[in-house]
Amino acid sequence: MALRCFPIWVCPQTTHHRSPLMGLAEFDADKRRRFCLWECSSSASQRAVTAIEGEIPFSRELKKSSDELGLTQETQSLSFHRDLSMLPKPLTANSLYSSDGDDSKVRISFQGIPGAYSETAALKAFPNCETVPCEQFEAAFQAVELWLVDKAVLPIENSVGGSIHRNYDLLLRHRLHIVQEVHLPVNHCLLGVPGVKKEDIKCVLSHPQALDQCVNSLNNLGIQRISAKDTATAAQTVSSSGKIDVGAIASVRAANIYGLDILAENIQDDVNNVTRFLILAREPMIPRTDRPYKTSIVFSLEEGPGVLFKALAVFALRSINLSKIESRPQRRRPLRVVDGSNNGSAKYFDYLFYIDFEASMADTRAQHALGHLQEFASFIRILGCYPMDLVR
């Protein structure tokens, strides 16, 4: 809905007379100045009125000729007019929804170098975006906070390797919001320099998780494994070294970027290997109910019997499905001491709980569930509400 601006007409209450000490030229200049300000205010007020759909613009009612005002317009007043089409357009609620339109101006930071799986996930979400490589995940977050980029992409879990625990800590450490999720099928390829055969490879470089996901294939080939910073860096290292007995495990895109041959595809042990990525931004999305949504939260609980059961029951009582639950120790307070009446003091590990549930914050069930959860939680924070990625 467009915003409507009403004009404000300012007229002096007292009648202006020419002072005996004011010359004729000064009087005319003063008159022209007041007239120009009047005309500029009138014109701007008429243009500022934006008609709402189904309504008649107010400009017809406000339009007055110079003759009605008893004034004669001078050409000098035209210099005061300004093209209001150059000013920012009124902000609407639709402006904050995620858009599937032009994304050519979106800049997305990721950890790694060109060819990394994180970059592929960013291009899947925004095919025309500009990707910005960062050395560390922390730097990718900071790039968004410093307005150097618009969004950041973060791998959060893999269907084989499980959760990436350190990245959960980053979600709490930074004040960014999850606005989208991306499920990326993983196709691990064995890469080598041009002209090399698979049997020539004696040593392979890749990210530790990629190596773990290809254990059976690498054991069958009898290849030694060496950890690298990420898959794309491994491909770049093999390409620059030129060694015929050294290979890399990386993506097809990395092979194309660094000029390597694909010696084998889909060498991961699980053919249905999928990595889930999160897209983060400075501002949250406005939740909707027109399609399936997911909400991610983090909270901590007071110590007590059955308190975790009670916390999870607030979702079960409202038929809200939990798709993910992850516990992480509180770094600032890893242990909690509880005094007993006769048995001394007991020490408990103090945990944070990360939960993904399948409901939008616009859904009253989710609102009531979180309100109920506050009765048991000592801390709660919504990390984001975003559309579910249903495309595989």
From Swiss-Prot:
The keyword Transit peptide applies. Expressed in roots, leaves, stems, flowers and siliques. GO terms for cellular component: chloroplast; chloroplast stroma. Converts the prephenate produced from the shikimate-chorismate pathway into phenylalanine. Dehydratase that uses arogenate and prephenate as substrates. Utilzes more efficiently arogenate than prephenate. Disulfide bonds: none annotated. It is found in: Plastid, Chloroplast stroma. GO terms for biological process: L-phenylalanine biosynthetic process. Pathway: Amino-acid biosynthesis; L-phenylalanine biosynthesis; L-phenylalanine from L-arogenate: step 1/1; Amino-acid biosynthesis; L-phenylalanine biosynthesis; phenylpyruvate from prephenate: step 1/1. Residues 1-48 form a transit peptide. GO terms for molecular function: arogenate dehydratase activity; prephenate dehydratase activity. Its EC number is 4.2.1.51, 4.2.1.91. InterPro entries: ACT-like_dom_sf, ACT_dom, Preph_deHydtase, Preph_deHydtase_CS. Residues 107-282 form the Prephenate dehydratase domain. It holds the Pfam family PDT. It comes from Arabidopsis thaliana. It catalyses: L-arogenate + H(+) = L-phenylalanine + CO2 + H2O; prephenate + H(+) = 3-phenylpyruvate + CO2 + H2O. Residues 296-387 form the ACT domain. Keywords: Amino-acid biosynthesis, Aromatic amino acid biosynthesis, Chloroplast, Lyase, Phenylalanine biosynthesis, Plastid, Transit peptide. This is Arogenate dehydratase/prephenate dehydratase 1, chloroplastic.
